[in-house]
Amino acid sequence: MKNIVCFGEVLWDVFPTHKKIGGAPLNFAIRLKSLNNNVSIISRIGKDKLGKKGVFFIVDKGINTESLQIDDTLQTGKVKVALDLDGQATYDIQYPRAWDNIQLTEASKQATLDADAFVYGSLAARDSTTKHTLYELLKIAKNKIFDVNLRPPYYDIDIVKDLMDEADFIKFNDDEIDMVCADMQFDKQSLEDKIKYIAEQTNTKSICVTKGDKGAILYYYDEFYYNEGYPIQVIDTVGAGDSFLATLINKLLNNDNPQEAIDFACAIGAIVAGSEGANPKITVEDITNFIESNS
């Protein structure tokens, strides 16, 4: 069992027919908690109805809320989600929202100091206030895990580079690593070459790239590990990458075999993509059975 802090946006995904609470940091937190970790969230929500519902939901999941801040004026985060015929999601992220105003507090500093790992993403750095808080916490964090989350127009390549330089572990999807390498004027086509280039430029020992239904590549202390993906009927992809990363990090923090780690992570990502919503209940037994049935 590890102490893990997740930093960034808490928001509501608004689908055409319903709303679900989410945001990558909260999705990480929920999955990490389900894997028997102690998890804290550093974020900010509004005093509105969605904020109140969010607090009840987060507390019910057993996540520590001592660093969950309440904003007097800004509303709780909201994202309009559209799904195409293949279940692939596109997002309209509203701005400004409460999570753009995360303050540096004693509670957030203490939670970060006490944590075995600190998970953060690039989307939270879209506003100067939350970006400043993130940069300050990264100065004192251990095992810094960076989820690259490029949502135009809310990213700046220079900020992404800063956040990569701070990271001990970086996770991209295949489109994101292509975009970052293009911005860094690295034009080799091999995914392995791109991963090694990022590792050299940032002095990061561990990088993972997800490839949708084609699995993922893990670069872990100079070795590559591969999973080619699992067949699944996609319902929606919201949260699949978040559960993937949470499961992968959980395995690696506990010194499990890297190949087993990426196999488990790809399996849970597939199961989530084949389910409705970002945080379906999934047990370790469910993952093991899924892998065995597809081996």
Question: Which functions belong to the PLM regions below?
Answer:
Residues 4, 14-79, 83-88, 93-99, ...:
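Substrate-binding N-lobe of the ribokinase-like
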Residues 8:
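Active-site beta-alpha turn of Rossmann-fold NAD(P)-dependent dehydrogenases/reductases
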Residues 4, 25, 29, 51, ...:
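A general structural signal for well-ordered alpha-helical segments in protein cores
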Residues 3, 188-295:
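Conserved phosphate-binding/catalytic region of the ribokinase-like
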Residues 32, 173, 241:
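Short, conserved phosphate/pyrophosphate- and ester-handling motifs at nucleotide-, phospho-/glycolipid
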Residues 12, 47, 150-152, 176, ...:
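Short, glycine/acidic-enriched loop or turn micro-motifs at the edges of active sites
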Residues 16-23, 49, 75, 154, ...:
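Residues at secondary-structure transition points
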Residues 2-5, 57-60, 65-68, 85-224, ...:
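Ribokinase/PfkB-type carbohydrate-kinase core domain
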